[in-house]
Amino acid sequence: MTATGRVLRCLRQSYFENERSIMTLPTREEAYALLHEWVESESLRRHMIAVEAAMRAYAHHYNEDEELWGLTGLLHDLDYERHPDMDDTENGHPRTELRLFRARNYPEPLIHAVEAHATFLGVPAESLLDKALLACDELTGLIQACAYVRPDRDIRSVELKSVKKKWKDKAFTAAIDRQENMHFIEALGVPFDEHVQRVLDAMKGVAVELGVAGE
């Protein structure tokens, strides 16, 4: 890294630390308790934990704040179970959780990323955090499904080539829009194979929590 790059990083870290002193990021324990308070569905909890793992992996890759990125992933669908009607312009996902996050003075980068991941709201994905959340969100669901259909039901046995094969099979997890998600990955600026491998490896690290550590 050049001297200029180091200076810019220090300035960015100093700015972010100042922002964090004003805003309040919950601890992981607090965020996890909030998840259990709001979400009863085991599958949705697992999805949110999977996205958390992927976001932490990307934060590490980019030398960003792993707590901020991880908790953004963990909390991004907090109100979905209670308010799944996205056409409800008052309370529909993610409007209720955004009000909660603002009321609790959560960091603006977390709030903006959660808002931007609901593309129908029209909020542009601008930061790396925003773009990573979009690129990781639905891919974790496809990878989770890849583990579910394995005889051993173990995500640690899933390989990149298997995920790529299922990605091409549009009947598999048909609700996932491949074209839209490829756009998100391209916006993040990471090669497809590298992106899938990073998310897959991150999810393997939380196999037990995801319920895909083998029968």
Segments from the language model and where they lie:
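Acidic, Ala/Val/Gly-enriched low-complexity intrinsically disordered segments
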Residues: 3, 7, 17-19
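Low-complexity, intrinsically disordered or signal/transmembrane-proximal segments
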Residues: 13-15
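Divalent metal-dependent catalytic cores for phosphoryl transfer on phosphate-bearing substrates
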Residues: 62-170, 182
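C-terminal binding/interaction regions
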Residues: 171-195
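Charge-biased, low-complexity intrinsically disordered regions
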Residues: 194-197, 201, 209-212
